[in-house]
Amino acid sequence: MRSSAAATLGAVTDQQHQRFERGTDGPKVIVAGIDGSDSSMRAAAYAAGLARRQNAMLALVYVQPVMSAGAALGAPVAEATGEVAEGLVNEIRTATERLKDIWNVRWEFHTFHGDPYNGLVTAADELKADAVIVGASESAGHRFVGSVAVRLVKAGRWPVTVVP
């Protein structure tokens, strides 16, 4: 016969197994923002290693910029940014083919539209991200406006890792 303390502990343990709390058992969905820059590709590589170790889904996200001013002047903006996204997908596929026998990482590629910060927020929300990985900004202008990474950290909604 079990003591009442053991029975209570057993009931608590049973309740904990049935309840899932997002982000408590290690990340299951890791979002990595990529834009083709060296730092974003390092962030993707770091995120892939983390996803492999945690057996998590790696969601590689490219935020396609909306450049209405360029489009208004007749520049083929959508075509150019679409080519960037396609180039990134091809580069990622080539890298994963080379490494598929060494590492087995489940990954998906997603394209969102908008500015990088809002695009990554939308992606992280829609994909139910447990963690967000981004590369450090390589732009001097971000010292004044604020980098995407800093804005994601300030949002306080996910653990954010910034890869140099």
Regions found by a protein language model. Give the residues of each.
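Acidic, proline/glycine-rich short linear motifs
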Residues: 2-23, 62-90
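General small-molecule cofactor/ligand-binding pocket signal
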Residues: 61, 108-112, 161
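Glycine-rich, Arg-bearing micro-motifs that act as flexible, cationic patches
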Residues: 131-155
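Short, hinge-like loop/turn segments at secondary-structure boundaries
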Residues: 75-79, 126-128, 150-151
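Short secondary-structure boundary segments
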Residues: 62, 135-137, 164
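Structural beta-alpha unit
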Residues: 1-25, 97-132, 139
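Small/aliphatic-rich secondary-structure junction motif
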Residues: 19-76
